[in-house]
Protein backbone atom coordinates (compact mmCIF):
# COMPACT_ATOMS: atom_id res chain seq x y z
CA UNK A 1 0.00 0.00 0.00
CA UNK A 2 2.91 2.32 0.88
CA UNK A 3 6.60 1.69 1.67
CA UNK A 4 7.32 0.51 5.21
CA UNK A 5 10.32 1.44 7.35
CA UNK A 6 11.26 -1.87 8.98
CA UNK A 7 13.25 -0.05 11.68
CA UNK A 8 10.14 1.73 12.98
CA UNK A 9 7.46 -0.72 11.88
CA UNK A 10 5.52 2.17 10.36
CA UNK A 11 5.18 3.92 7.00
CA UNK A 12 8.41 5.41 5.64
CA UNK A 13 8.27 8.97 7.02
CA UNK A 14 10.67 10.46 4.45
CA UNK A 15 8.73 9.02 1.51
CA UNK A 16 5.47 10.18 3.05
CA UNK A 17 6.82 13.73 3.24
CA UNK A 18 7.91 13.55 -0.39
CA UNK A 19 4.44 12.40 -1.43
CA UNK A 20 2.74 15.22 0.44
CA UNK A 21 5.12 17.73 -1.18
CA UNK A 22 4.41 16.37 -4.67
CA UNK A 23 0.63 16.77 -4.28
CA UNK A 24 0.72 20.03 -2.31
CA UNK A 25 -0.51 22.05 -5.30
CA UNK A 26 -3.58 19.81 -5.74
CA UNK A 27 -5.40 21.33 -2.78
CA UNK A 28 -6.37 18.02 -1.16
CA UNK A 29 -7.93 18.53 2.30
CA UNK A 30 -5.85 15.73 3.82
CA UNK A 31 -2.30 14.54 4.44
CA UNK A 32 -1.39 11.01 3.36
CA UNK A 33 -1.00 9.66 6.88
CA UNK A 34 -4.55 10.78 7.71
CA UNK A 35 -6.11 8.47 5.13
CA UNK A 36 -3.85 5.41 5.44
CA UNK A 37 -4.81 2.63 7.88
CA UNK A 38 -2.75 1.96 10.98
CA UNK A 39 0.15 -0.44 10.45
CA UNK A 40 -0.13 -3.66 12.49
CA UNK A 41 2.42 -6.44 12.87
CA UNK A 42 1.53 -10.13 12.96
CA UNK A 43 0.13 -11.19 16.32
CA UNK A 44 -1.39 -7.83 17.20
CA UNK A 45 -5.11 -7.33 17.79
CA UNK A 46 -6.85 -6.04 14.67
CA UNK A 47 -10.33 -5.75 16.17
CA UNK A 48 -13.40 -7.95 16.50
CA UNK A 49 -16.25 -8.91 14.21
CA UNK A 50 -19.17 -6.50 14.62
CA UNK A 51 -22.87 -7.36 14.58
CA UNK A 52 -23.16 -5.69 11.17
CA UNK A 53 -20.22 -7.67 9.86
CA UNK A 54 -21.60 -10.95 11.17
CA UNK A 55 -24.96 -10.32 9.48
CA UNK A 56 -23.21 -9.39 6.23
CA UNK A 57 -21.24 -12.65 6.22
CA UNK A 58 -24.01 -14.95 7.47
CA UNK A 59 -27.66 -14.00 7.05
CA UNK A 60 -28.74 -17.12 8.96
CA UNK A 61 -27.45 -15.63 12.21
CA UNK A 62 -25.25 -18.59 13.14
CA UNK A 63 -22.06 -16.55 12.96
CA UNK A 64 -21.78 -14.55 16.17
CA UNK A 65 -20.13 -11.13 16.62
CA UNK A 66 -17.05 -10.68 18.77
CA UNK A 67 -14.70 -13.01 16.87
CA UNK A 68 -11.13 -11.68 17.34
CA UNK A 69 -9.36 -10.68 14.12
CA UNK A 70 -5.69 -10.90 13.19
CA UNK A 71 -4.09 -8.27 10.93
CA UNK A 72 -5.13 -9.14 7.36
CA UNK A 73 -2.56 -10.11 4.74
CA UNK A 74 -2.57 -10.43 0.97
CA UNK A 75 -0.97 -13.19 -1.08
CA UNK A 76 2.53 -11.99 -0.20
CA UNK A 77 2.20 -12.18 3.57
CA UNK A 78 0.19 -15.39 3.61
CA UNK A 79 2.63 -17.02 1.19
CA UNK A 80 5.60 -16.22 3.42
CA UNK A 81 3.77 -17.63 6.42
CA UNK A 82 2.51 -20.74 4.63
CA UNK A 83 6.08 -21.65 3.69
CA UNK A 84 7.74 -20.36 6.87
CA UNK A 85 9.78 -17.95 4.77
CA UNK A 86 9.84 -15.16 7.35
CA UNK A 87 13.48 -15.39 8.45
CA UNK A 88 16.41 -13.60 6.80
CA UNK A 89 17.98 -15.50 3.86
CA UNK A 90 14.80 -17.52 3.30
CA UNK A 91 12.39 -17.16 0.43
CA UNK A 92 9.37 -18.62 -1.28
CA UNK A 93 7.88 -18.83 -4.73
CA UNK A 94 4.10 -18.75 -5.26
CA UNK A 95 3.26 -20.06 -8.71
CA UNK A 96 -0.20 -20.21 -10.27
CA UNK A 97 -1.75 -18.07 -13.00
CA UNK A 98 0.76 -15.43 -11.90
CA UNK A 99 4.03 -16.00 -10.07
CA UNK A 100 6.06 -14.16 -7.50
CA UNK A 101 9.19 -14.83 -5.48
CA UNK A 102 9.92 -13.19 -2.14
CA UNK A 103 13.30 -13.13 -0.44
CA UNK A 104 13.76 -11.86 3.14
CA UNK A 105 16.74 -9.51 3.03
CA UNK A 106 19.66 -9.10 5.42
CA UNK A 107 20.16 -5.48 4.34
CA UNK A 108 18.52 -2.95 1.98
CA UNK A 109 19.17 -3.21 -1.75
CA UNK A 110 21.96 -1.01 -3.09
CA UNK A 111 19.85 0.50 -5.88
CA UNK A 112 16.30 0.87 -7.15
CA UNK A 113 15.25 -1.80 -9.65
CA UNK A 114 11.96 -1.45 -11.53
CA UNK A 115 11.72 -5.24 -11.70
CA UNK A 116 11.75 -5.54 -7.89
CA UNK A 117 9.00 -4.54 -5.42
CA UNK A 118 9.85 -3.94 -1.77
CA UNK A 119 7.38 -5.40 0.76
CA UNK A 120 7.69 -6.81 4.28
CA UNK A 121 7.06 -9.99 6.20
CA UNK A 122 3.94 -9.98 8.41
CA UNK A 123 6.34 -9.12 11.24
CA UNK A 124 7.75 -6.12 9.35
CA UNK A 125 11.13 -7.32 8.03
CA UNK A 126 12.19 -6.13 4.52
CA UNK A 127 11.43 -8.42 1.58
CA UNK A 128 12.38 -8.15 -2.09
CA UNK A 129 9.60 -9.40 -4.37
CA UNK A 130 9.73 -10.29 -8.05
CA UNK A 131 6.17 -10.39 -9.39
CA UNK A 132 5.29 -11.59 -12.89
CA UNK A 133 1.81 -11.32 -14.38
CA UNK A 134 2.21 -14.49 -16.43
CA UNK A 135 2.83 -18.02 -15.20
CA UNK A 136 0.46 -20.91 -15.96
CA UNK A 137 -2.39 -19.22 -17.87
CA UNK A 138 -1.03 -20.25 -21.27
CA UNK A 139 -0.16 -23.71 -19.97
CA UNK A 140 -3.68 -24.09 -18.56
CA UNK A 141 -5.14 -23.17 -21.96
CA UNK A 142 -3.16 -25.93 -23.67
CA UNK A 143 -4.25 -28.46 -21.05
CA UNK A 144 -7.83 -27.38 -21.78
CA UNK A 145 -7.21 -28.08 -25.46
CA UNK A 146 -6.03 -31.60 -24.64
CA UNK A 147 -9.17 -32.12 -22.53
CA UNK A 148 -11.31 -31.03 -25.49
CA UNK A 149 -9.42 -33.45 -27.74
CA UNK A 150 -10.12 -36.31 -25.32
CA UNK A 151 -13.83 -35.43 -25.27
CA UNK A 152 -13.93 -35.88 -29.05
CA UNK A 153 -13.34 -39.58 -28.35
CA UNK A 154 -15.88 -39.74 -25.55
CA UNK A 155 -13.28 -39.49 -22.80
CA UNK A 156 -14.10 -37.18 -19.89
CA UNK A 157 -10.70 -36.71 -18.31
CA UNK A 158 -10.46 -35.82 -14.63
CA UNK A 159 -8.94 -32.34 -14.46
CA UNK A 160 -6.45 -33.11 -11.69
CA UNK A 161 -5.42 -36.37 -13.36
CA UNK A 162 -5.00 -34.61 -16.70
CA UNK A 163 -2.70 -31.97 -15.21
CA UNK A 164 -0.61 -34.48 -13.24
CA UNK A 165 -0.24 -36.80 -16.26
CA UNK A 166 0.87 -34.00 -18.58
CA UNK A 167 3.20 -32.48 -15.99
CA UNK A 168 4.83 -35.84 -15.34
CA UNK A 169 5.17 -36.38 -19.08
CA UNK A 170 7.20 -33.16 -19.25
CA UNK A 171 9.90 -34.77 -17.13
CA UNK A 172 10.59 -37.19 -20.00
CA UNK A 173 11.47 -34.31 -22.35
CA UNK A 174 14.91 -33.11 -23.41
CA UNK A 175 16.62 -30.60 -21.15
CA UNK A 176 16.58 -28.07 -24.00
CA UNK A 177 12.95 -28.94 -24.77
CA UNK A 178 14.01 -30.35 -28.13
CA UNK A 179 14.43 -26.90 -29.66
CA UNK A 180 10.95 -25.67 -28.71
CA UNK A 181 10.29 -22.24 -27.21
CA UNK A 182 7.07 -21.08 -25.56
CA UNK A 183 6.22 -17.46 -24.80
CA UNK A 184 3.47 -17.50 -22.17
CA UNK A 185 2.52 -13.81 -22.15
CA UNK A 186 -1.26 -13.70 -21.83
CA UNK A 187 -1.01 -10.15 -20.51
CA UNK A 188 1.53 -7.35 -20.33
CA UNK A 189 4.68 -8.01 -18.36
CA UNK A 190 6.35 -5.11 -16.50
CA UNK A 191 9.49 -7.14 -15.75
CA UNK A 192 10.30 -7.28 -19.47
CA UNK A 193 8.66 -3.97 -20.39
CA UNK A 194 5.78 -5.33 -22.48
CA UNK A 195 2.40 -3.60 -22.25
CA UNK A 196 0.32 -6.37 -23.87
CA UNK A 197 0.59 -10.12 -24.07
CA UNK A 198 0.78 -12.34 -27.14
CA UNK A 199 1.16 -16.06 -26.32
CA UNK A 200 3.37 -17.84 -28.84
CA UNK A 201 4.85 -21.27 -29.45
CA UNK A 202 7.95 -21.51 -31.64
CA UNK A 203 10.09 -24.36 -32.89
CA UNK A 204 12.88 -24.93 -35.34
CA UNK A 205 12.32 -27.19 -38.36
CA UNK A 206 14.71 -29.71 -36.82
CA UNK A 207 13.14 -29.59 -33.36
CA UNK A 208 12.01 -32.77 -31.63
CA UNK A 209 8.25 -32.25 -31.62
CA UNK A 210 6.56 -34.39 -29.01
CA UNK A 211 4.27 -34.15 -26.03
CA UNK A 212 7.06 -34.33 -23.44
CA UNK A 213 9.11 -31.52 -25.00
CA UNK A 214 5.96 -29.48 -25.63
CA UNK A 215 4.91 -29.63 -21.99
CA UNK A 216 8.44 -29.08 -20.74
CA UNK A 217 8.84 -25.93 -22.84
CA UNK A 218 5.64 -24.47 -21.38
CA UNK A 219 6.70 -25.31 -17.83
CA UNK A 220 10.03 -23.57 -18.46
CA UNK A 221 8.19 -20.56 -19.91
CA UNK A 222 6.02 -20.29 -16.80
CA UNK A 223 9.12 -19.42 -14.74
CA UNK A 224 11.38 -17.78 -17.33
CA UNK A 225 10.40 -14.18 -16.57
CA UNK A 226 10.70 -14.82 -12.84
CA UNK A 227 14.30 -15.87 -13.41
CA UNK A 228 15.07 -12.50 -15.03
CA UNK A 229 14.06 -10.69 -11.85
CA UNK A 230 15.74 -13.18 -9.54
CA UNK A 231 19.02 -12.85 -11.43
CA UNK A 232 19.02 -9.15 -10.50
CA UNK A 233 18.81 -10.06 -6.81
CA UNK A 234 21.24 -12.97 -6.90
CA UNK A 235 23.85 -11.61 -9.31
CA UNK A 236 23.66 -7.80 -9.18
CA UNK A 237 22.68 -7.40 -5.52
CA UNK A 238 24.47 -10.52 -4.26
CA UNK A 239 21.49 -11.52 -2.13
CA UNK A 240 22.15 -14.71 -0.18
CA UNK A 241 19.50 -17.42 0.13
CA UNK A 242 19.67 -20.45 2.41
CA UNK A 243 16.32 -21.99 1.48
CA UNK A 244 13.48 -21.59 -1.01
CA UNK A 245 10.03 -23.12 -0.59
CA UNK A 246 7.47 -23.43 -3.36
CA UNK A 247 3.68 -23.30 -3.08
CA UNK A 248 0.70 -22.79 -5.35
CA UNK A 249 -0.94 -24.77 -8.13
CA UNK A 250 2.25 -25.31 -10.15
CA UNK A 251 3.58 -27.52 -7.35
CA UNK A 252 0.55 -29.78 -6.87
CA UNK A 253 2.09 -32.52 -9.02
CA UNK A 254 4.85 -33.90 -6.82
CA UNK A 255 8.37 -33.17 -7.99
CA UNK A 256 7.59 -31.54 -11.34
CA UNK A 257 7.23 -27.81 -10.69
CA UNK A 258 9.80 -28.27 -7.95
CA UNK A 259 12.39 -29.57 -10.44
CA UNK A 260 11.66 -26.82 -12.98
CA UNK A 261 12.03 -24.11 -10.32
CA UNK A 262 15.29 -25.65 -9.07
CA UNK A 263 16.65 -25.45 -12.62
CA UNK A 264 15.49 -21.84 -13.02
CA UNK A 265 17.03 -20.68 -9.74
CA UNK A 266 20.02 -23.02 -9.65
CA UNK A 267 19.15 -23.65 -6.02
CA UNK A 268 17.56 -26.40 -3.90
CA UNK A 269 13.77 -26.11 -3.63
CA UNK A 270 11.47 -27.59 -0.99
CA UNK A 271 7.71 -27.98 -1.36
CA UNK A 272 5.22 -28.56 1.43
CA UNK A 273 2.30 -30.95 1.53
CA UNK A 274 0.03 -27.90 1.76
CA UNK A 275 1.55 -26.44 -1.45
CA UNK A 276 -1.77 -26.13 -3.25
CA UNK A 277 -3.46 -24.28 -0.38
CA UNK A 278 -0.82 -21.53 0.03
CA UNK A 279 -2.73 -18.40 1.01
CA UNK A 280 -5.54 -20.06 2.95
CA UNK A 281 -3.04 -22.06 5.00
CA UNK A 282 -0.97 -18.95 5.65
CA UNK A 283 -3.78 -16.78 6.98
CA UNK A 284 -5.00 -19.66 9.16
CA UNK A 285 -1.54 -19.80 10.75
CA UNK A 286 -1.49 -16.03 11.28
CA UNK A 287 -4.89 -16.24 12.98
CA UNK A 288 -3.61 -19.07 15.18
CA UNK A 289 -0.51 -17.02 16.04
CA UNK A 290 -2.73 -14.11 17.08
CA UNK A 291 -4.71 -16.45 19.33
CA UNK A 292 -2.02 -18.71 20.78
CA UNK A 293 1.31 -16.86 20.82
CA UNK A 294 3.21 -16.67 24.09
CA UNK A 295 4.67 -13.49 25.57
CA UNK A 296 7.66 -12.39 23.47
CA UNK A 297 7.27 -15.25 20.99
CA UNK A 298 8.17 -14.19 17.44
CA UNK A 299 6.25 -15.36 14.40
CA UNK A 300 9.26 -17.38 13.25
CA UNK A 301 9.60 -19.11 16.63
CA UNK A 302 5.88 -19.87 16.68
CA UNK A 303 5.94 -21.42 13.22
CA UNK A 304 8.91 -23.71 13.90
CA UNK A 305 7.40 -26.43 16.11
CA UNK A 306 3.68 -25.79 15.68
CA UNK A 307 3.04 -25.66 11.99
CA UNK A 308 5.65 -27.49 9.97
CA UNK A 309 6.47 -30.81 11.57
CA UNK A 310 6.38 -33.51 8.87
CA UNK A 311 5.02 -31.08 6.26
CA UNK A 312 8.07 -30.48 4.07
CA UNK A 313 8.58 -32.76 1.11
CA UNK A 314 12.11 -33.81 0.02
CA UNK A 315 14.26 -31.03 -1.39
CA UNK A 316 15.19 -31.07 -5.08
CA UNK A 317 18.33 -29.35 -6.35
PLM ranges: what are they?
Residues 2-33, 40-245, 250-311, 317:
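Active-site core segments that coordinate phosphate-bearing ligands/cofactors
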Amino acid sequence: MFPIDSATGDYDAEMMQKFDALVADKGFPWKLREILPKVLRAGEMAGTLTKEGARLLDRSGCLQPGVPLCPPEGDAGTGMTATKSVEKRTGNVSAGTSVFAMIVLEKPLSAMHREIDMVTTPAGDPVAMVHCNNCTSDLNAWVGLFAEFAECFGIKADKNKLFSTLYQKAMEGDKDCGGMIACNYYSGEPVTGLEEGRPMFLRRPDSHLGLANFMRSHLYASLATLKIGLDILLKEEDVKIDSITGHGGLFKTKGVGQSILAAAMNAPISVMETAGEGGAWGIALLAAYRKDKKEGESLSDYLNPVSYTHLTLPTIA
